[in-house]
């Protein structure tokens, strides 16, 4: 199931940072993630399975554009179209927004 994250807790931000570190070997600090989600600068979409986050897509909103910060899926859950579904959520969000473009 996909959830859009626009409000965060310390625990959620810590889980997101751990997932990113597990996927890529580096991650935003959980305090930064928490603050930037809660101030509206970052938005995350997460894919949960059995109450565990197994994939995510993160964006940063700027004045006119959306910047994709990262997208990833745990190796054990790949080839199930999770990244595609997360990207479709972003596109739907973009289509009803006032942003000009999506940047990588």
Per-region residue spans from a language model:
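Conserved GNAT acetyl-CoA-binding A-motif
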Residues: 94-104
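Acetyl-CoA-dependent GNAT
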Residues: 3-76, 84-89, 93
